[in-house]
């Protein structure tokens, strides 16, 4: 059981624990399990790291991210064409991103990714390769998953994989399969568990989409 103040402190400590993040840069407020992050950082990577750190704190049901990016000096500001070239170069060195499968658009530092890939881990790798680049202020990942395999998705295999995971073994997660789509419903204790369940479902052969409708239902106590 956590109060708003306790949850706020835990999130602040989680952010502080990240070596390149500073609590002084990021403001944290907590209300009924919803965390709001504000402040200014000098890279997109820091922005996403702060959000991930907050999501993984026990008791967090949702994160509202309002962090702004302001580069420390003009040397970090890059032309959109330069950013696009750096993204494509990053993909050439990344074995998880199939060559010439991802289309890149850059507008005022905001990168949009499009195309079709076979696996979700490839889609995530494409996004992760971009977030570390200087000059990037945001990423929209519109890559679609279209697996080549024609295997029928086995609901039981996904359920077994979820039960094998130490953080999910005692959770009641319902799995529904409709064609190439998997839907997860039920309740979990943390944002981490919700994300982990979705990641596991994506690994099933033949999956084109995962609708993660799991509800984070943490026992929450308001402060007096």
Predicted features and spans:
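N-terminal targeting leaders
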Residues: 1-224
């Amino acid at each position: 059981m956590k109060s708003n103040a306790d949850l706020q402190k835990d999130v602040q400590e989680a952010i502080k624990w990240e070596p390149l993040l500073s609590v002084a840069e990021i403001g944290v407020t907590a209300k009924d399990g919803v965390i709001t992050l504000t402040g200014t950082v000098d890279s997109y990577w820091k922005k996403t790291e702060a959000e991930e750190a907050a999501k993984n704190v026990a008791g967090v049901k949702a994160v509202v991210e309002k962090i702004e990016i302001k580069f420390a000096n003009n040397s970090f500001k890059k032309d959109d064409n330069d950013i696009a070239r750096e993204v494509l170069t990053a993909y050439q060195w990344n074995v998880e991103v199939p060559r010439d499968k991802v289309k890149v658009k850059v507008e005022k530092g905001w990168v949009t990714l499009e195309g079709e890939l076979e696996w979700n881990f490839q889609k995530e790798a494409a996004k992760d390769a971009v977030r570390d680049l200087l000059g990037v202020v945001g990423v929209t990942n519109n890559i679609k998953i279209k697996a080549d395999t024609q295997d029928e998705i086995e609901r039981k295999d996904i359920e077994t994989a979820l039960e094998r995971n130490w953080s999910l073994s005692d959770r009641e997660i319902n799995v529904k399969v409709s064609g190439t789509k998997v839907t997860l419903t039920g309740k979990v204790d943390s944002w981490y568990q919700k994300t982990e369940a979705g990641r596991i479902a994506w690994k099933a052969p033949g999956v084109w989409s995962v609708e993660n409708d799991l509800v984070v239902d943490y026992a929450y106590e308001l402060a007096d």
